[in-house]
Amino acid sequence: MKKELCVILILSTLFFVQAAENSSYKVMVLGDIHYDNAEFHQKEAPSKALKKERIRNYEMWKGPSVRLLESAGKRAKSESCVFAIQMGDIAQGDADTPELLGKMLEKAFRTVKSHFPDIPLLAVKGNHDIRGYRKTIQRPADNVLMGLVAKELGAGKGSSWTFRKGKDLYIGIDGFRPEKQCIAFVKKALQDNPDTRYVFLVTHLPLIPATVHSPFWNLPGNFEIADLLEKRKTVVLAGHTHSFSIVSRKSRNGKLIQLVSTSLGRDWLSGKPMQPSLDWTSVREAAQKTVRGKNAEKTRRILETLDSKGEYSARIYTRISGYVILNIGEERVEAAIYTGEGKPVLMEILAENR
């Protein structure tokens, strides 16, 4: 077990460019995708909820999910994106055996990669990527999915990774490890890279609460990690919630902005306008409602810590899918959110270099 964890936590580092290269570039960001196919499910779904998810996924991958990826691939090429990042839940999971889960993850990754043949495709683990039949299975995601990511990075395999793009540091975190390991990984990455322009934390689970459905299902060690990151010019990129959102935390030490993305095919070209539907008050009220039962005291302490860490704001948007292009330059990091073939529906500054 110790040997396995040692391998999992290898720090994978790659310098894609020399420091002298142009400091402006663009990155494609994809949210949850949930690739699925009947060939991985020979057994009946173990619950009605999972049966509905399978039906949803099969319908998505008959057309909408493919068209979303086609659009993203064309956009990445026309905008000269230098790499693409997928925010976890690249696959549905729930495969009948560990071997089938590994095959599902490989096919999911290669399906997405086929739309970005000329640039590296990176990913982090999502909760569905480690979902076996009725139980959690880490090994296929560690060996297969993260093995494919390691090849894209050109570095050693690990379920968490880092790389430098010029003056910018990217930290891809495995949010399904113990809290101490998550904190230690981020801390070491920052210590090893003191000279950054921007830091990008790539995580499936949000760092800052971004949903009213499970407001405390966040990255392990999220408070400590946020304290470390707010001292840098940091952008947090997350998935998991199936809704676009922009959440910020401001304290005396700095400001963090988190962008959550979603790329579920069922919400692609849905015809809905992209508009805010919930704010931080909604998230806070949902969190307060969880203070009950046998874990009430523990939850209350978490909520008190959340409140003490700074001032928050949030815009959680209506359910609509798409993708994001990050325009990273010397003055700022700006996100362009696309939910169709036309112009971006939202432009948002995520960090400023001043």
Residue ranges: model-predicted function:
Residues 1-4:
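Positively charged n-region of N-terminal signal peptides that target proteins for export
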Residues 6-14:
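Bacterial N-terminal signal peptides
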Residues 19-99:
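N-terminal active-site segment of His-dependent metallophosphoesterases
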Residues 25, 35-42, 179-182, 210, ...:
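Short, solvent-exposed loop/turn elements at domain surfaces
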Residues 32, 88-89, 126-127, 204, ...:
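Active-site glycine-centered loops adjacent to acidic/histidine catalytic or metal-binding residues
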Residues 40, 49-50, 55, 95-198, ...:
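Extended active-site neighborhood of metal-dependent phosphoesterases/phosphodiesterases
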Residues 86, 94-106, 333-354:
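C-terminal/domain-terminus segments
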Residues 195-212:
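Short acidic, glycine-rich surface-loop motifs adjacent to enzyme active sites
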